[in-house]
Structure formats: structure tokens, C-alpha cells
């Protein structure tokens, strides 16, 4: 199985990536920084606040997990624009783009 995780070093993305490592799945990671606590096949640096994600690289994934988020940790003071864009706008935009491209796998979002 080939999975792509959007979000690299958060609690959720790390836990899912470690599971993917255990079961031997091909793992592509997308985020601001390379994953620290898991192995991965490919890392793609993306900043969803700067540019829209090119979804064409996701099309051969059996499963895409959106685990990017903002405003979750009380100790971080993140602006409302960042919180709304990462938790609402970006996942909806990606979902719509995947639909346009006739993506046949599963898209799961926690945003």
C-alpha cells in the first residue's frame, strides 16, 4: 500500500507514519520540515500558506491523510487566518482538486 501524509512532525502524522513503517507501506510525507521520528520513502517540502498543493503527485496513493493543523496546542499563539486556512480552506481545496482529478483512493482529513 502507498500512503501520503500531509503534515510531518505532529502527534497524529508521526503516529500514523510509524504504523506505516511497521506494516511496510510506502510512505510519502509532505510538510514544512522532514520527518524526525519515522522512516519515509519521499519527503516533499510544502507550505500551504504560500502556495496551493500540486495534487498530481498524490494520485497514485492508495490513501492520503491530511494531518496538518493549527490552533490545536494552547501554548502556541497562531493567528486566526493561519488556523482557518490550514484547518478549513486547505483540506477543502485539496479534496475538491482530488475530485477534479478523479482520485480513486481514500482521502482522510483531520483538519
Regions found by a protein language model. Give the residues of each.
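Structural motif
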Residues: 2, 62-63, 106
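N-terminal Rossmann NAD(P)H-binding glycine-rich loop of SDR-like oxidoreductase domains
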Residues: 3-23
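SDR active-site strand-loop-helix element
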Residues: 6, 30, 67-68, 107-111
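Short, charged/polar "capping" segments at the starts of alpha-helices
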Residues: 12, 34-39
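Conserved glycine-rich Rossmann-like NAD(P)H-binding loop of the short-chain dehydrogenase/reductase
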Residues: 25-34
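Rossmann-fold cofactor-recognition segment
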Residues: 37-51
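NAD(P)H-binding glycine-rich loop region in Rossmannoid oxidoreductase-like domains
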Residues: 48-86
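Conserved Rossmann-fold NAD(P)-dependent oxidoreductase catalytic core, especially the SDR/UDP-sugar
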Residues: 92-111
